[in-house]
């Protein structure tokens, strides 16, 4: 798992749009805050790390099926269960739409900072466990 920033994120955006017609941005919003990290590994067995040059749109395109976008959520609240029951999770609309579009290539990693507990979930897992859902938009005008 690694963090990509700046031009690397823009190149990833270009590769998804060019090869899969998946837009990682909404309107003019190009900040790509809908994910924090990428995991680069073969999705088919044997699952192993894949080296991808994120400065090259072509290399990213060639390896898109091996890239999983990861959104990390963390908390140190003591009232959260070990399996993250009772966790009120902020989930942006962009994160949700991207997770749905990418299916199994988008994951949420939940981290309890105090306990060191970490779990990985798909968007379907989150919805299956959701007690309440409140979606909202936060918009900054020019």
Question: Which residue stretches match the model-derived regions?
Answer:
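Domain-level recognition of nuclease-like catalytic cores that cleave nucleotide substrates
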Residues: 97-142
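A short acidic (Asp/Glu
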Residues: 49, 81-83, 120
């Amino acid at each position: 798992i690694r963090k990509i920033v700046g031009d690397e994120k823009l190149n990833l955006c270009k590769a998804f749009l060019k090869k899969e017609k998946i837009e990682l941005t909404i309107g003019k919003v190009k900040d790509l805050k809908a994910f924090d990290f990428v995991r680069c590994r073969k999705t088919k067995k044997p699952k192993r790390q894949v080296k991808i040059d994120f400065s090259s749109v072509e290399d990213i395109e060639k390896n898109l099926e091996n890239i999983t976008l990861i959104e990390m959520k963390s908390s140190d609240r003591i009232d959260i269960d070990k399996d993250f029951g009772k966790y009120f999770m902020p989930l942006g609309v962009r994160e949700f739409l991207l997770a749905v579009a990418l299916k199994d290539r988008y994951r949420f990693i939940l981290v309890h900072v105090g306990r060191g507990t970490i779990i990985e979930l798909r968007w379907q897992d989150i919805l299956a466990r959701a007690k309440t859902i409140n979606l909202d938009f936060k918009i900054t005008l020019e």
